[in-house]
Regions:
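Feature captures the catalytic ectodomains and active-site-proximal regions of enzymes
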Residues: 1-394
Length: 394
């Protein structure tokens, strides 16, 4: 059943922790992006002793962190082979699926053909249809929505089709139903996510509720997760992992409130699951700090996560492998509030794995997926080269 000595793998995604622009960053308007280095430079210093002990300061391009003499983990960085820089494409590539066709974006609103399909299939009109901030557009169109009953449709720099409706005008279940109809249309146009955005309140005090729901494009091919599940391995997705993989290839899905809850749930999984993959995404770095250009908040969130690493390591057995990486960048110090096209860190720890190996610059995030596939003996994924032997051969 795979590489005899590894029974369980913990894969932790520090969402958006890029470590320097990729060679093609200028094609994405991301020249000068370096999420980690720029956060440290902005603040003057950062306290990440546990990531430093693992060797993050030794990774090519990382500056301002201690270059420890004897790291407890092996280290490197990964380039993205797919076209794009979003969460889905990054995570799918980690799991062995490379995407060469970017998701569609509509900075000027959705074309007539898409909106006509929506009106016909959903059986109702709409308001909006432009790129906008969600809080601003409900201020602008909320009252008209209440008068007409028409949902508010808007997008952003990302590949999203967002539908906002007042909970008293359109019950949430009906909004979800309309989103499912929109998901069918979005599938035909390669749109990453349809998002239900319910809100409540009166004019002047509209506010979004926590009943947001994402309807995501499922991976367009098999991933590591599908193969693991088909081979009888438990696959636990913590945080937004379920949404990212279209709720496929998972045996357990665990939702989280925030990063610290994500760490708690990861530790719960370590106590409860003795084999297979535990796959956690800590999204706050990206959602709360990267997109909002809050470098100080990002730095504090990194310090909070770093403090918890010894707890995770404390629950690891000799037959575990612990991998830390990211899915893209989101540099809070650049004018852009969007993701950035960057290298991501690679840290690999195991009580029985060789520490201090420089795994170099890997050509694709898929090297992680292929390493996990080899460790569990499930054969080749579509892409990626395993680095397992570098860590296991004495």
């Amino acid at each position: 059943m795979g590489h005899s000595s590894i029974q369980r793998i913990i894969l932790l995604i520090l969402d958006s922790l890029g470590i320097g622009e990729l060679p093609d960053a200028k094609e994405y308007n991301d020249e000068g992006s370096n999420t980690l280095n720029n956060i440290i430079r902005d603040r003057g210093s950062i306290h990440l002793p546990n990531l430093e002990a693992m060797g993050i300061g030794l990774i090519q391009g990382v500056e301002g962190l201690e270059r420890v003499k004897n790291p407890i983990a092996s280290y490197g960085r990964l380039a993205e082979a797919s076209i794009g820089k979003d969460t889905f494409i990054g995570h799918w590539e980690i799991a062995g699926l490379i995407i060469n066709k970017p998701f569609s974006t509509y900075p000027d609103g959705f074309p007539k053909a898409i909106m006509e399909s929506f009106e016909k299939e959903a059986g109702l009109g709409f308001l909006g249809n432009k790129a906008a901030s969600g809080t601003e557009i409900i201020k602008e169109l909320g009252e008209e929505h209440i008068k007409t009953g028409r949902p508010i449709i808007y997008t952003s720099a990302d590949s999203v089709f967002q539908i906002a409706a007042h909970e008293e005008i359109m019950p949430v279940e009906r909004l979800y139903e309309i989103c499912r109809i929109a998901r069918g249309i979005a599938d035909r146009h390669n749109i990453g996510r349809v998002i239900a955005r319910p809100f409540t309140g009166a004019k002047g005090s509209f506010r979004r509720t926590e009943r947001r729901k994402d309807f995501s494009l499922a991976p367009t091919g098999d991933t590591l997760l599908d193969k693991l599940k088909a081979n009888g391995f438990p696959v636990t997705g913590i945080g937004k992992i379920g949404d990212i993989y279209g709720h496929r290839g998972l045996t357990h899905e665990v939702h989280t409130k925030d990063n610290m809850d994500g760490v708690d749930k990861t530790i719960d999984a370590l106590k409860g699951v003795d084999k297979g993959l535990i796959f956690t995404n800590l999204v706050d770095f990206d959602m709360l700090y990267g997109h909002r250009n809050d470098a100080r908040g990002y730095a504090m969130a990194l310090e909070d996560a770093d403090k918890r690493l010894p707890e995770i390591i404390g629950f690891l057995k000799g037959s575990d492998m612990f991998i830390i990486t990211a899915d893209h960048g989101c540099d809070p110090t650049t004018p852009s509030t969007d993701h950035s096209r960057e290298y991501v860190p690679l840290l690999v720890y195991g009580k029985r794995l060789r520490p201090g190996i420089n795994l170099g610059t890997r050509k694709t995030f898929a090297d992680i997926g292929q390493t996990i596939a080899e460790a569990f003996g499930i054969g080749r994924l579509g892409h990626g080269d395993s680095f397992l032997r570098k860590l296991t051969i004495p």
